[in-house]
Amino acid sequence: MGSFGLRENEIMTVDLHTMNVSEAKAWLKGKVDRAPREIREIEVIHGYHGGTALKNMVLRSFHHPRVRQKIMGLNPGSTILILK
């Protein structure tokens, strides 16, 4: 079982390390656009040691029709996107 009681095939992880904010936003949008319907959750690894720009983008300015909710991860370097 994955987080929130989901099976492994319902969770996807994306890593934004090494990207700037505009690259990361476009790349994340593409990942959510192409995520199969069975994917219910995306763990976004944005890091936190290098600053909060990516984290702030994910939490505040990233919007997508498929994203129902954003939850801060247990690790301060990640955010969970709950999909519709």
Model segments located where?
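Long, charged, low-complexity intrinsically disordered regions
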Residues: 1-84
